[in-house]
């Protein structure tokens, strides 16, 4: 029993180390070869705030080149040295889109997701697209942590806010997705895959109307690997992709949730490349989405997103962002995106 317990713990630690190494490879974050101490960074930031106006360039040169752990240590040192909250000082010194982007970046990943969700579920700033994107693109372990952080930050359960601010089948899929345990492994039960593909066909394209309950059950209970296998089986049996079936059988925010879950099961980087392109297409730029995606994915898989963007749109993501933004706001986002290669 004891040996089994420690073996399991060792395997868990090894998986975490592998994920950490993978994140480092996929991240676009660049930093100095020998990072200054958090204390030195705190001193330099304090200097940047002094005098007439804020030295935005100095702030970007530090903040945009430190990882989540380093940023947390800088905030701790700043508070200790100057008896002042760095987050609040940044909010008072920066303005406009640069302020929004930097403050979003200063959070740790789970705290950032919780903040995005809380703002998206607020009666004053409701943004169900951002809520759907964040919830339906995160892994079960990320959602588990996120729910705990959400409650500790805002004193209310995430499920309660979803219940209050969403409607119908959109509400049902979000609640099911954040409360149902799912495997993060790659094991697939082929018999169950075939049964699920048949059930989805029977619930959608085969009948007049749609049995939304079946879509909600399967999309919320099955792992990403299992959903990818269902899609392949569905295509083989019925000559149509599951994505097309979802588009023809559902609509609105419910459709958005199902498509986000399915596309992130296949290829999260490709999904986010599409989201970024849409944010920069048409009249004006959707800066809220641009900031949210770049800031939340920089330390996770932005290298992959950049590659998918280049592949699909024949233009680098850096060039696209450069043409749609300006000033220090542009400099900050491009710093997060790393070299244009």
How does the language model describe each region?
Residues 22-341:
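Structural signature for extended repeat/solenoid scaffolds and their inter-repeat hinge/linker regions
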Residues 2-23:
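Intrinsically disordered, low-complexity terminal segments enriched in Ser/Thr
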